[in-house]
Amino acid sequence: MEIKILERKDNLVEIELINEDHSLPNLLKDILLTKEGVKMASYSIDHPLLHPETGRYISNPKITIITEEGTDPLEVLKEGLRDIIKMCDTLLDELKEKK
């Protein structure tokens, strides 16, 4: 997965996820909204049309995070991604126990 930082300020970061769909940004947004110090977390795909040959969106998802003063939006983003990894690890462990 490729990521591009579009804008970076003390309390704001906007990133673009290259060749991704709604799956990760939607989950990440929901997790970020539960984090202390996060004022706003959202994502958008500017143009929802799919490319006929690749099946990918013509536009890439953009995630925007705005935090309260003293909260680094990139650190909150990393924390949210680690939370997703933990969720997946927990699910994998539960599936192993079901064998």
UniProtKB/Swiss-Prot annotation:
It is found in: Cytoplasm. GO terms for biological process: DNA-templated transcription. It catalyses: RNA(n) + a ribonucleoside 5'-triphosphate = RNA(n+1) + diphosphate. PROSITE patterns: RNA_POL_L_13KD. Transmembrane segments: none annotated. Keywords: Cytoplasm, DNA-directed RNA polymerase, Nucleotidyltransferase, Transcription, Transferase. This is DNA-directed RNA polymerase subunit Rpo11. GO terms for cellular component: cytoplasm; DNA-directed RNA polymerase complex. It comes from Methanocaldococcus jannaschii (strain ATCC 43067 / DSM 2661 / JAL-1 / JCM 10045 / NBRC 100440). DNA-dependent RNA polymerase (RNAP) catalyzes the transcription of DNA into RNA using the four ribonucleoside triphosphates as substrates.
